[in-house]
Amino acid sequence: MLEQQRNSADALTVSVLNAQSQVTSKPLRDSVKQALRNYLAQLDGQDVNDLYELVLAEVEHPMLDMIMQYTRGNQTRAANMLGINRGTLRKKLKKYGMG
């Protein structure tokens, strides 16, 4: 089961346009790292207090949106796919104005 999850995680890729105008795929985590690098560079040494929540919201909201579309709004199925209980899913959907 863990091996299956790892293989599934490898499927989380992003298509990007490289310098030679070719579309390539790279792991989602690499795109997140690059976005964080860019964000931190823009801070120019200043501190920020809510980075965890900011990043979580940027990933969590679209993930919830897509999983709810995929499950056709079935919260029980969505919660199972996400590995969280349905009550937690409902709280998260409410947080983002989705439920």
Curated annotation (Swiss-Prot):
Keywords linked to the UniProt accession: Activator, DNA-binding, Transcription, Transcription regulation
Source superkingdom: Bacteria
Segments passing through the bilayer: none
Molecular function (Gene Ontology), one example: DNA-binding transcription factor activity
DNA-binding span(s): 75-94
Family membership: Belongs to the transcriptional regulatory Fis family.
Subunit structure, interactors included: Homodimer.
UniProt cross-references to HAMAP family, sorted A to Z: DNA_binding_Fis (MF_00166)
Protein task: Activates ribosomal RNA transcription. Plays a direct role in upstream activation of rRNA promoters.
Protein name, as recorded: DNA-binding protein Fis
Species whose genome carries this gene: Haemophilus influenzae (strain ATCC 51907 / DSM 11121 / KW20 / Rd)
